[in-house]
Amino acid sequence: MDYAMKSLSLLYPRSLSRHVAVSTAVVTQQLVSEPSRETPRARPCRVSTADRKVRKGIMAHSLEDLLGKVQDILKLKDKPFSLVLEEDGTIVETEEYFQALPRDTVFMVLQKGQKWKSPSEQRKKKAQLSLSQKPTKKIDVARVTFDLYKLNPQDFIGCLNVKATLYDTYSLSYDLHCYRAKRIVKEMLRWTLFSMQATGHMLLGTSSYMQQFLDATEEEQPSKAKASLLPACLKMLQ
C-alpha cells in the first residue's frame, strides 16, 4: 500500500514539473559553463624574416601568444616589429583577423625600417647586386705552364713539358727530355772544356796580335830618329 502511494506521488503533476525544471536548470548550467572552460586550440603557422632566409614553424593559441613566441625565437626582445602576411603584406593587428586566417598561414616579421617585398622584387634586387659585385671578365692573352715529371725514378731532373696557350684557342706544347745525372755532368764538363779551349785560343790569338803590333811600333820609332839626325849633321858640317 505504501509503495502504491509513493508511486502515485511521483506521478503527481507538481512533482513531475518540479523534476523537469531541475533537470532543465542543470542542463542549462552545463551548456553555459562549458564554453567558458574552452580555450582556443593551438594553431600551426610559420614565420619568416623580411629577406625570407629564415623560416620557423610555431604553434600559437592567439595573436598575443604568437607575438611572444616570435619575440623569443627571433631574439627581438625590446625591438619593435610587426606581423604581416607573407603573400601580400597585409598587416595582422587584431585577434579576430588572426583567428579568421587558415591554418599554416605564413607570417612575415618586419622590424623598424623594413618593408614588405614580393619574391620577384627580392630576386630582382639580388640579381642586380650580384651583377654589380661581379668582377669584369678578363681574357687571357697568353698562358704558359710548366710540368716537370719523371719517366724513371732514377732520373735526376726528369722531363719538362712546356705548354703555351694563346687567347684560349691556340696551344703549343714541347717536351724536353733530360738525361740522367751522370750524363748531365758529362755534358756540362764537355761544354766547360770546350769553352775553356775556345777562350784559350782567343787569348793566344789576341796576345800574338798585340805582340806584333808592339814590335811594329818599336821598329818605326828608331827609323824616324835616324832620318831626323842626318839633316842636323849636314848643317853642322857646312
Curated annotation (Swiss-Prot):
Subunit and partners: Homodimer. Interacts with CIDEA. Homooligomer; undergoes liquid-liquid phase separation (LLPS) via its N-terminus, facilitating lipid droplet fusion, occurs at the lipid droplet contact sites. Interacts with PLIN1. Interacts with NFAT5; this interaction is direct and retains NFAT5 in the cytoplasm. Interacts with CEBPB. Interacts with isoform CLSTN3beta of CLSTN3; inhibiting the lipid transferase activity of CIDEC.
Protein name, as recorded: Lipid transferase CIDEC
Domain notes: The CIDE-N domain is involved in homodimerization which is crucial for its function in promoting lipid exchange and transfer.
Region (Required for liquid-liquid phase separation (LLPS)), start-end ranges: 1-35
Keyword Nucleus (UniProt): yes
Family in the record: Belongs to the CIDE family.
PTM field: Ubiquitinated and targeted to proteasomal degradation, resulting in a short half-life (about 15 minutes in 3T3-L1 cells). Protein stability depends on triaclyglycerol synthesis, fatty acid availability and lipid droplet formation.
Signals that turn on the gene: Down-regulated upon hypertonic conditions.
Cellular component, GO, one term: cytosol
UniProt KW keywords: Activator, Apoptosis, Endoplasmic reticulum, Lipid droplet, Lipid transport, Nucleus, Transcription, Transcription regulation, Transport, Ubl conjugation
Function, in words: Lipid transferase specifically expressed in white adipose tissue, which promotes unilocular lipid droplet formation by mediating lipid droplet fusion. Lipid droplet fusion promotes their enlargement, restricting lipolysis and favoring lipid storage. Localizes on the lipid droplet surface, at focal contact sites between lipid droplets, and mediates atypical lipid droplet fusion by undergoing liquid-liquid phase separation (LLPS) and promoting directional net neutral lipid transfer from the smaller to larger lipid droplets.
GO MF annotation, one: molecular condensate scaffold activity
Catalytic activity: a triacyl-sn-glycerol(in) = a triacyl-sn-glycerol(out)
Top-level taxon: Eukaryota
GO biological process, one term: execution phase of apoptosis
Subcellular location: Lipid droplet; Endoplasmic reticulum; Nucleus
Species the sequence originates in: Rattus norvegicus (Rat)
Sequence ranges assigned to domain CIDE-N in this UniProt record: 41-118
Gene giving rise to this polypeptide: Cidec
